[in-house]
A protein has these predicted regions:
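Short glycine/serine/threonine-rich phosphate/pyrophosphate-binding segments
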Residues: 14-24, 79-83, 102-110, 133-135, ...
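Short, ordered loop/turn segments at secondary-structure junctions
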Residues: 10-12, 33, 38-43, 75-76, ...
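Short glycine-rich or small-residue beta-strand-to-loop segments that form or flank ligand, phosphate
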Residues: 4-12, 69-72, 94-100, 170-175, ...
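Accessory alpha-helical/coil subdomains and C-terminal extensions
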Residues: 35, 87, 98-100, 106-121, ...
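N-terminal phosphate-binding or glycine-rich loops at protein starts, especially the Walker A/P-loop
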Residues: 1-46
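C-terminal non-catalytic interaction/assembly regions of soluble proteins
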Residues: 248-406
């Protein structure tokens, strides 16, 4: 029977998935392999009748530079009792290529172990994907899709900023980011937003809604002192991962709840929440400022990949073939800034519980500190006297004091 490889994608979309799929498929087709695409991720792989597509060169050439995913994706995480050998044996699968985040990679390792125990030998190689840029790749190596999402996000954010200038309003912008603030920071820094709020900046104090609102007001008042009546704040949605349910519920926003009793944050606009809370506080302070919410999220996930990600994803796809020929398995494929293909093993980035720790924004790096201390607008000691016309206690809105930074 002809040897084959199987490709599946898990989690949510990111620009460049089709480029990875096409690049992997082309190089294996060239060597005479069947290339089978699996719809619905792991849910499809272990279903009674998997929904598959067999790739040929013409189809790969068609999807290579297109956004979205030719393979329908799924967040399904199968239990061990769902595993079966049928599909792998019946199709003579020699390699399972998974595209996704850390959960997708960990599941691939579990499957590989199960197959080995049942005398079915295959390799599995993972292509790390997320627009959040939070997988623990080597320093300076982005996750694919991040650069495109940042570029598209910056275009939207720049338009929003121009609207603020034109209308004399403020905008509260929320950007995707599961726990890390890479996307919000990258977009905000690119557009010179006067306030950027990400989870990592609270490295010396606990994150709270009160502090987030004070940081926004600090920027608004500083701009008033400078004679600027407009602006924009960008907040990473990741801040919500560090708030308690009690504090989230205290916002008085109407939430739906999951089976575990947790507020379903995915059903509401984080920008709307923070804008409502900001307006409430501004009214208490008798500060007249109009603000509007803007959510930047799903618009970024299926856009056409940028030139950076087109090349990067092509290298990752070809890199899968390179690692396969080297006999590598149970690893992620990475490409360093020089274009070299390097395997990264999950065991080297997992904690003692087998969980992959997210890569956070390095808040102490020179790049980050340059942006926070020089590009943002906020109240500091020299502004106290001028700020008293708006705030009774300007010191409470001092950026450095709120964060407990030196």
């Amino acid at each position: 029977m002809k040897k084959s490889i199987t490709i599946l994608a898990g989690g949510g979309p990111a620009p460049g998935i089709n480029t990875v799929i096409a690049s992997v498929a082309k190089v294996f087709l060239k060597e005479g392999f069947r290339v089978i695409g699996m719809h619905q991720g792991y849910k499809g792989l272990f279903s009674h009748k998997p929904d598959t597509i067999e790739f040929d060169f013409a189809f790969c050439d068609k999807i290579m530079n297109v956004g979205g995913s030719a393979l329908q994706m799924s967040r399904h995480k199968p239990k061990n009792e769902e595993f079966k050998t049928d599909f792998f044996v019946n199709n003579n699968v020699k390699l399972l290529v998974t595209i996704g985040g850390d959960d997708t990679a960990s599941t691939a390792n579990r499957i590989s172990k199960f197959l080995a125990e049942n005398h079915v030998s295959i390799q599995n190689i993972h292509v790390p994907k997320t627009i959040d840029n939070d997988l623990p790749l080597p320093e300076g190596t982005p996750t694919f899709g991040y650069q495109t999402a940042k570029e598209t996000g910056a275009s939207i954010a720049a338009t929003v900023y121009e609207d603020a200038r034109t209308s004399g309003n403020w905008f509260v912008v929320s950007a995707m980011g599961r726990e890390a603030g890479h996307l919000a920071f990258g977009i905000g820094a690119s557009c010179h937003y006067p306030m950027i709020i990400i989870p990592e900046m609270f490295n010396e104090t606990r994150i709270s809604i009160e502090k987030i609102i004070k940081l926004m007001i600090s920027s608004i008042i500083k701009r008033k002192i400078l004679g600027i009546d407009y602006g924009a704040v960008i907040i990473s949605e990741g801040v919500f991962h560090f708030l308690t349910n009690t504090e989230i519920e205290a916002t008085e926003i109407n939430f739906t709840y999951d089976d575990h009793g947790h507020p379903e944050l995915g059903n509401v606009s984080k920008a709307h929440i923070f804008n409502m809370l900001l307006q409430k506080k501004l009214k208490e302070l008798k500060v007249s400022v109009k603000s509007r919410p803007v959510e930047i999220g799903y618009e970024l996930r299926c856009v056409t990949p940028s030139a950076f990600d087109l090349l990067y994803c092509s290298l990752l796809g070809i890199g899968v073939h390179t690692l396969f020929n080297e006999g590598k398995t149970g690893c992620m494929v990475t490409s360093n800034p020089g274009g070299d293909i390097i395997p990264l093993y999950l065991k080297d980035v997992e904690d003692e519980n087998g969980k992959v720790k997210p890569r956070l924004v390095n808040i102490q790096s020179q790049k980050t500190q340059l942006v926070f201390r020089n590009n943002l607008h906020f109240i500091h000691e020299n502004d106290y006297e001028a700020a008293k016309q708006y705030l009774e206690n300007p010191e409470d809105y001092d950026f450095l004091k709120i964060l407990n930074w030196d």
